[in-house]
Amino acid sequence: MPPADRQAPRAALDSGPKLGDKRARARDLGIHIGLLPSGDHDAITDVDGVSVGHATVREEGRLNTGVTVVLPHRGNPYRDKLPAALVVQNGYGKLVGATQLQELGELESAIALTATLNVHRVADALLDWLLELPGNEDVRSANVVVGETNDGRLSDIRARAVGPEHVTAAIASASMGAVEVGAVGAGAGTVCFGYKGGIGTSSRVIGGHTIGVLVQTNFGGQLNVR
């Protein structure tokens, strides 16, 4: 995805509403968006079996980047594939694994998000992890999925600072509970509407089903709330 607009971000990396020492989310402040109820965590992890982990890379004045990993379930994603689809709207990106998602409609790996120039490093590490899972010893073709945004305004993107150890750490930290949001993982260096962007998540429950989303916000324009 292209970098956000060139207007300087108007919020520091660690700014935001807080309740005590805990960073507050909208519903913590009594703000309820929409009519449908959310799940227990108001997160993508309210979908049964889904877990999320982050690894953040920071170096004062130089690096604000990282990787976020979404595990579709706790089993072997290659052996227990899931139905999947892909829609691209009003943008372009460097999404690894897009063709098989479109053509076969199956997900057979975890999904990772990172910075644009880290995509292939993360994909290589994610493939190593997948091939090393028990039961995958004879796998000769696998489709990992890695998305990205350009965090080059707040990080030295050419450093390609996310490596295999960060992917491993993100997977190891993946939890099916509350999801850490904001300037963390793949959201560490993002900018949105001229403000600090980050990782966001939510869920809604309808008719006995749970819909969960996770976003890596990084785009330009002006936000007008009327």
Regions found by a protein language model. Name each.
Residues P2, R6-R226:
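Alpha/propeptide regions of enzymes that mature by internal proteolysis
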